Regions:
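Asp-box/WD-like beta-propeller blade repeats and closely related beta-sheet repeat scaffolds
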Residues: 244-273
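Beta-propeller domains
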Residues: 176-202
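Conserved beta-strand position repeated across blades of beta-propeller domains
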Residues: 62, 122, 165-168, 221, ...
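Blade-loop segments of beta-propeller domains
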Residues: 195-222
């Protein structure tokens, strides 16, 4: 951009900054829009990033309902991609208790690596848990010794699927596991028996944008009647930084929804059917960092939220009991809950229907949520149970649940600063 163009853009940029500040001050004093009078729902658990590396990245799991590991029955099992650890959560006397199940850093004999980067958990039809190693493409399962020790075992070690980020069952009594290869393939294999053969369900590599490690084929969900109708759903990123939700019967695709992304990361993309028969879709805040566009607290955008869709027809429709149906403020009626940074992954307890979400944090904290209709889970006013420490420190020290006009204006001002290069480039 020429110097005179930059100079011309500066006054307009300043105008935008001032406008947003005054919008935050006056509009939010009414208490009717995002950022004012927040009623944030606490995560059931949060944990701090590794003290040495400063990183962490939660991978949501399942409430264990299988029979092979009695010690974990009824506990929520989840892991961390960066730390390579697996934990369990259990409600005891009204408080959640977190226990380390397995530390792959301390047990490197399984792969020879420093850790297993746990990219996904999967559940068989009988309720047994598997998890994937994105780096080696191998699959592992949980088991229990006669003495009660929970162990991790390699599952069919001759099967290796590169960049594996998802494990699913089809609910069709076939006892197969389906594995997502991030570049755009879905493979299946039998759980029982000695066969290491894999079958290709879908190959859309030529349609998928997977340049960034958070892009690619991201989600898979089988129609509750898949055994009879062969219908399944996927999410994947396409060129132009767009997340697409599609319905498939064989190779025949019907595009249901496309969400433009301002950046390549924080697409979310995990999908699952709930016990109510509706499809739930997890969406990240659109990326970069600090929720650069304030998407997660803005009910007028789908980003940073969990959607609930009726996909029984040729196009999707909105269930009549979604929490924002019929609102007068142009809030997106597809939204079931909001205030998420990058939900990865979520599941329903097959016994009581509770919806558990692992939401990936940024600076210090990862969190586990039990999600309810209409709930606000706090990002980017809060990370885990803590007030989010903005690098600009405009609103440090304020109560996360009592964001006033000045504070919200500063919050929005920060977002303009974060996106200033984008704005100038656009101008």
């Amino acid at each position: 951009m020429a110097t005179d163009e930059v100079n011309a853009a500066i006054p307009f940029t300043v105008f935008l900054l001032v406008s947003v500040m005054f919008y935050g001050l006056f509009d939010n004093l009414s208490g009717e829009d995002e950022g004012s009078g927040l009623d944030l729902i606490d995560p059931v658990w949060d944990y701090e990033h590794d003290t040495e590396s400063g990183y962490g990245s939660v991978t949501g799991g399942f409430v264990y309902r299988g029979s092979n590991v009695p010690a974990l029955y009824g506990k929520y099992v989840y892991g961390d991609f960066i730390l390579g650890a697996i934990w369990s959560l259990e409600l005891v006397d009204g408080k959640y208790v977190n226990e380390l199940v397995y530390d792959t850093k301390a047990n490197t004999s399984l792969t020879g690596n420093n850790r297993i980067p746990i990219s996904s958990f999967g559940e068989s039809e009988s309720g047994e848990l598997f998890f994937s190693d994105r780096s080696t493409g191998r699959i592992f399962t949980l088991n229990q010794t006669g003495s009660g020790e929970v162990t991790v075992e390699s599952f069919k070690p001759d099967i290796s699927i590169p960049l594996m980020i998802g494990l699913y069952n089809a609910g069709d009594s076939s006892n197969r596991i389906f594995a997502i290869e991030q570049v755009g393939r879905i493979h299946s294999f039998e759980i029982d028996g000695d066969s290491n053969d894999t079958t290709l369900l879908l190959d859309i590599v030529n349609n998928v944008e997977s340049t960034d490690w958070e892009q690619g084929l991201l989600g898979l969900a089988f129609d509750p009647d898949f055994k009879n109708n062969g219908v399944f759903f996927i999410t994947y990123t396409i060129p132009g930084d767009t997340l697409r939700l599609s319905k498939f019967i064989g190779d025949n695709e019907t595009i249901l929804l496309e969400i433009d992304q301002p950046y390549v990361n924080h697409n979310g993309g995990h999908i699952a059917f709930g016990p109510d028969g509706y499809l739930y879709v997890g969406l990240g805040d659109g990326g970069k960092y600090n929720d650069a566009f304030d998407h997660a607290q803005n009910l007028k955008t789908l980003k940073g939220s969990l959607l609930r869709l009726d996909v029984s027809g040729e196009t999707y429709s909105i269930p009549s009991d979604n929490p924002f149906v019929g609102n007068s403020k142009d809030y997106k009626e597809e939204i079931f809950a909001y205030g998420f940074r990058n939900p990865w992954m979520f599941s329903f307890d097959r016994e009581n229907g509770d919806l558990w979400v692992g939401d990936v944090g940024q600076d210090k904290w990862e969190e586990i949520d039990i999600v309810v209709a209409g709930g606000n889970y706090g990002w980017a006013f809060r990370e885990g149970k803590q007030c989010f420490d903005s690098p600009f420190e405009h609103y440090d020290g304020h109560s996360c649940g009592e964001i006033d006009g000045w504070t919200f204006g500063a919050f929005m001002y920060e977002r303009i600063l974060l996106n200033l290069p984008l704005m100038i480039a656009f101008l």
